[in-house]
Amino acid sequence: MAKSPKKPAAAFFDIDNTLVRGSTSYQFGKAAYKRKFFPRKDFIAFAWHQVRFIAKGETEHMLAAIKDRALELVKGRSYDQMKALIATVYDEEIKSKVWPETAKLAQQHVAAGREVWLITAAPQEMGEEIAKRLGLTGALGTRLVKIDGILTGEIDGKPLHGKEKAKALKKLAKERGFSLKKSFAYSDSHNDLPLLSMVGHPVAVNPDKLLKIYAKSAGWKIYDFKRKELRPVKKSIKQEIKIGKKG
């Protein structure tokens, strides 16, 4: 009897606070504000969410607030315009905020011949742009609804967060033939425990308090790249808030 072919391993990375410092949705919002997509008061709210996000990690309430504001600012905009802005945002804001240590981990998986996927609550287009720039396989993210090339301000299904990430991973593994038992997953948030628990090699990166406790008790690897860079990033954002108030 012929042996069934061995299923390959893959690697899956969260983006915000795992691969990139802070919220990529905030960075998109900042770029949109500079181009007068929305008023000053919305930018200030975005910035305060970012300070809290970097300092404390994600919460359901915070993610919902960021998502709602992001959807509101793209409502009525052309899809192509949004994609072009995302590419600009990567060059102007995100590229410099990629943690080189996390990016190196991703590249090590690429060098080992594994597919590397980003899985994020941010719009899928944001994840795809980052994956393309870093030479990774692809991305899964929250899907935005568009009609005749215009964004409606709604999402297709649920935000890719928490248990929804785990569902998406399971579906992707089935489609691509991955062995989850052999695979790797990286995240900073306890909200991603459903996803991390699905793979044989879960890793906590810049973990929030709850994930750090769980990872230690479970014997998972823990990487903390955040401590040395947290203070200057928070200072920079607070300066942006002051500029927004004066603007």
What are the residue ranges of the model-derived segments?
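Acidic/polar active-site rim loop that often engages polyanionic ligands
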Residues: S25-F28, W48, I66-K67, G149-E154
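Active-site neighborhood of HAD-like aspartate-dependent phosphohydrolases
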Residues: A2-A55
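Metal-dependent phosphoesterase signature
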Residues: A64-E101
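Conserved active-site and cofactor/substrate-binding residues in soluble primary-metabolism enzymes
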Residues: S23, R77, E164
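Hydrophobic alpha-helical segments typical of transmembrane helices
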Residues: F28, I66-R69, Q81, M126, ...
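C-terminal cap/substrate-recognition subdomain and adjoining C-terminal extension
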Residues: A2-P8, A84, D91-W117, A121-G247
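Cysteine/selenocysteine-centered motifs that mediate thiol-based redox chemistry or coordinate metal-sulfur cofactors
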Residues: V51-A65, S236
